[in-house]
Amino acid sequence: MKRLLAFLVCAMAAGLAQAQPERFSREKYIDKGDTLYYRMLFPDANRQRKYPLVIFLHGSGERGADNDAQLKWGVMNFATDQNMLAHPAIVIAPQCPEHQTWSSTTPDKDRRRMTLNADPSKPMRLLIALIHKLDTAMPIDTNRIYITGLSMGGYGTYDALERYPNLFAAAVPVCGGGDTSRVASIAHIPMWIYQGAEDPAVSPLYALAMLEALTNAGAHPGFTQYPEVGHFSWLGAYSDPLMMEWLFRQHK
């Protein structure tokens, strides 16, 4: 499996060399004195048509206010020449401020489940407000809004789905966890879950608990667990061409 993961990463290396951060414009959203910095990729295509919207949530190590760090992992795979030609999309990569999180949850002691808190985190509130602003101001296909994230962003992906179950057309949570008691409301959303079996930072039990709960609720999520892989399962996830093809086929 390590060889397969290495192959997937190497296969994307040439394309990533062409995907420059400058393709993402620098933006910020301000609401009631709070600021959410984000980068935006707009496809080099017909600006008169509508495009899918991809929301990419980074991990805890990329928090800050430089509006750069959130491009470090994963999201650049959406900006390769090959992907932009095959799957033109508007991609939003927000940056969570220091000492804050995308999700607002309380983990259970058994490290298998999360409990969704009543109110969203401030970054999540700002993100959802930004999405609603963009879908009225930009050529977005509201039947094809996708969300994905890694580590802290994986938790954030589940958080967004469970709070706003009618907003998203598909999701790809990578090494994250959610509130299993709320999966009935999101069982209709196509999902592909990724996890490293040896992850020391995000217990695989979280992903497995969500997989079990979703399946019991009648969902049919995709699930890829990399044996002998730790916390960097996103290297394989976002280099997986099958996942990319699958994601852009989804719609409400």
Per-segment meaning from a language model:
Residues 1-22:
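Bacterial Sec-dependent N-terminal signal peptides
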Residues 17-53, 89, 123-129, 148, ...:
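A domain-start/cap signature at the N-terminus of enzymes
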Residues 44-49, 104-150:
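Gly/Ser-rich "nucleophile elbow"/oxyanion-hole loop immediately N-terminal to the catalytic nucleophile
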Residues 57-59, 195-196:
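The conserved beta1-alpha1 loop
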Residues 60-124:
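Active-site machinery of serine-nucleophile hydrolases
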Residues 72-82, 175-184, 205, 209:
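Alpha-helical scaffolding within the catalytic cores
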Residues 132-187:
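Primarily recognizes the serine-hydrolase "nucleophile elbow" in alpha/beta-hydrolase
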Residues 174, 190-252:
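C-terminal catalytic histidine-bearing segment of alpha/beta-hydrolase fold enzymes
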